[in-house]
Structures are given as C-alpha cells and as structure tokens.
C-alpha cells in the first residue's frame, strides 16, 4: 500500500476575487478521489480577508487587555472580532474562533502577506471547502475531497504542524471503536485524526516562508465520503474537553 503527496507548483500570488479552482485546474490534472490540501492563506486572500491595523478601532475589552499585556490594542481587537472565547491573553492570545477552531491569535496571519497588511482566516472554512470542492469537481469531472489547512503549535511540544480547519467530502475522524487489534482485543476508544494527519503530511511539502507551496494533492488513499461533513465533528464536546475546563479555571481565578 502506498500514496503520493504531489505539490501543485507555480500557483501565482492570490488576490481578492481570484478563482482558486480554475487556477488549480490550470496547473495540474486531477484524478477521482484525489484529496486536495489547500492552505487557508490563499483561501482567505481570495475571499478578501485582508485588513490593516490602522483601520481597526479597539473597543473597551481590547483596551483593557492591552493595558494588562502591553500588546497593540488594535491587534487585540482584530483577534476579539473573530473569537467566541479567550482562554489566554499573554504571551499570546489563545482563543476559540467563531468557526469553533481553538488556536493562537484567532489564526490571524502576518506572514505571506504584503507589508502593512494582515490576514484573517476564512470566515467559514467548511463552507469555503464546499464551494471550492464543488467547483473543482465541476471543472475536472472528478470526485474530490478538500481539506483547508492552517499551521498550529502543539501544547506540549515545540514546533508547528498542519491541521485541518475546513473539509469537504471527507470525514475528519476515523473511529476504530469495535474493531479488533492484532491480538483480538476489541478497541474501545481509538479514534484516528485522518484530516489532521493528511494536513500534516501535506505540510511537509507546503513548507513555510517564501518557498511555500499552497496546494498539495494526496493521491492513492480513499477517504472520499459524500454527504454532509464538517471539521466540527473532530472538536471535543464541551463536557469532555478537560483542557478548556482547566484553562477556564485558571482564567477565572485571576
């Protein structure tokens, strides 16, 4: 068994209004059940999620956090505008975004963007993946899966890895519960983070900085799944998320 990870090279700089599916199809031929891994940065650029700090007016909460942390209140306001809950204020802001993804600084990106500008993540990554996927399928005539990715740090390790923040035609988690292991024991809790693993694999080719590749095809693995899918299926239910519960306890003690 094997699979390929194929970098889609020579993707041009993306601007607001660009047709990503058309651009991708011009650069590479697609096959049935290809899994398209697309960096959130180019999706956000095409959707016009670019802003400047000088256009941000901080509110009362942003000013209060700035007074406590010494951060730029305009940047804090930008983070708050995309967040439903703040867990940590410094040395970085750890938040859950409006889309439900928990990450640093609401996923706002200061890299791979023109000087003086910053980039919000896609407002609804699942909806973005669906739109891109349907158009790619229409243009190519192939059945495709889409994963929109971002890079995240890990709580207990150094370094970032690719993670899925939006999906189309793929389940984010494979549940092995009820299957048997090598010794015939029934698995009770094993759940494999398929979408995140694929995002991490693609990130080896995507890289970071000036040499980044924003689109990678995973070919040879069949995780195609028609019907409604959402990255939210991979988020822990609130009553099971002990890390968030612990962060809330620490926050409320201050």
From Swiss-Prot:
Q: How is the cofactor bound?
A: Binds 2 divalent metal cations per subunit. The ions could be magnesium and/or manganese. Monovalent cation. The ion could be potassium.
Q: Name one GO molecular function term.
A: GTP binding
Q: What is its EC number?
A: 6.3.2.31, 6.3.2.34
BP terms from Gene Ontology: F420-0 metabolic process
Q: Tell me which cofactor or cofactors this protein depends on.
A: Mg(2+); Mn(2+); K(+)
Among InterPro entries, the record links this protein to: F420-0_g-glutamyl_ligase, F420-0_gamma-glut_ligase-dom, F420_ligase_CofE_arc
| Pathway of action | Cofactor biosynthesis; coenzyme F420 biosynthesis
Q: Which UniProt keywords apply?
A: GTP-binding, Ligase, Magnesium, Manganese, Metal-binding, Nucleotide-binding, Potassium
**Positions contributing to a divalent metal cation 1 binding:** 109, 150
Q: Which reaction does it catalyse?
A: oxidized coenzyme F420-0 + GTP + L-glutamate = oxidized coenzyme F420-1 + GDP + phosphate + H(+); oxidized coenzyme F420-1 + GTP + L-glutamate = oxidized coenzyme F420-2 + GDP + phosphate + H(+)
Which residues are a divalent metal cation 2-binding? 151, 208
Could you say which residues bind GTP here?
Answer: 11-14, 40-41, 45, 112, 206-213
Q: Describe the protein's quaternary organization and the partners it interacts with.
A: Homodimer.
Functional summary from the UniProt entry: Catalyzes the GTP-dependent successive addition of two or more gamma-linked L-glutamates to the L-lactyl phosphodiester of 7,8-didemethyl-8-hydroxy-5-deazariboflavin (F420-0) to form coenzyme F420-0-glutamyl-glutamate (F420-2) or polyglutamated F420 derivatives.
Which NCBIfam families is this protein grouped with?
F420_cofE (TIGR01916), PRK13293.1 (NF009809)
PANTHER family, per database record: COENZYME F420:L-GLUTAMATE LIGASE, PTHR47917
Family note: Belongs to the CofE family.
This chain's protein is named Coenzyme F420:L-glutamate ligase
Lineage, broadest ranks: Archaea, Methanobacteriati, Methanobacteriota, Stenosarchaea group, Methanomicrobia
Gene that this sequence comes from: cofE
